[in-house]
Design a protein with these regions (language model features):
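N-terminal secretory targeting signals
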Residues: 1-70, 75-80
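Catalytic glycan-binding domains that act on GlcNAc-containing polysaccharides
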Residues: 48-173
């Protein structure tokens, strides 16, 4: 339970930090990527389908899913869709080493939890994946409107930027 409270506090702190500063989205742009980075990101995309969250403790998993489901109920009225979204988000964020609460905040800002959101510059889906990422690390079969694909790309891209910015979340976001 203390892990759940700590995770919730971290998520709220990060959300407050993001809201305290005006958004300065510099926009993603295609940049040269080393073969090693490209290969690493491609391998990360090639994993198996999500079947559960990354929690090791089922009580923590149930508590997190219940609380996050309650918070998202107005934005995602269909409970089965909401649970699939949360399960996939938790797995993909954890897999990429990104706090799931941070991913939820990113999605709220980027797409308002709209699966088919498209930005004026062509970013797509929940995490607003830019088309050049699919070309750079994916393949033509990857659909950024597909839930698992979008959350996986979003988590990996966020992890990539966090690494580039040496853990500075403000700059990475």
């Amino acid at each position: 339970e203390s892990d759940m409270k700590r995770t919730t506090h971290i998520g709220l702190l990060l959300a407050a930090l993001c809201l305290a500063h005006p958004a300065h989205s510099g926009g993603q742009r295609e940049e040269a990527m080393s073969a090693n980075v490209r290969s690493s990101l491609q391998r990360a995309l090639a994993d198996t389908a999500v079947t559960r969250t990354a929690f090791r403790n089922t009580a923590d998993e149930a508590a997190w899913l219940k609380e996050m489901s309650r918070r998202l109920a107005k934005r995602m009225p269909d409970e089965s869709e909401r649970m699939e979204f949360l399960t996939t988000l938790h797995w993909e964020a954890s897999r990429a080493g990104v706090d799931p609460q941070l991913m939820l905040g990113l999605i709220q800002v980027e797409s308002g939890f709209r699966k088919y959101a498209v930005s004026p510059v062509g970013a797509r889906g929940y995490t607003q994946v830019m088309p050049f990422w699919v070309k750079a690390i994916g393949n033509a079969d990857h659909n950024p409107f597909q839930l698992r694909t979008n959350l996986r790309y979003g988590a990996l891209i966020l992890r990539h930027y966090i690494d580039i910015e040496r853990g500075d979340l403000y700059r990475a976001l």
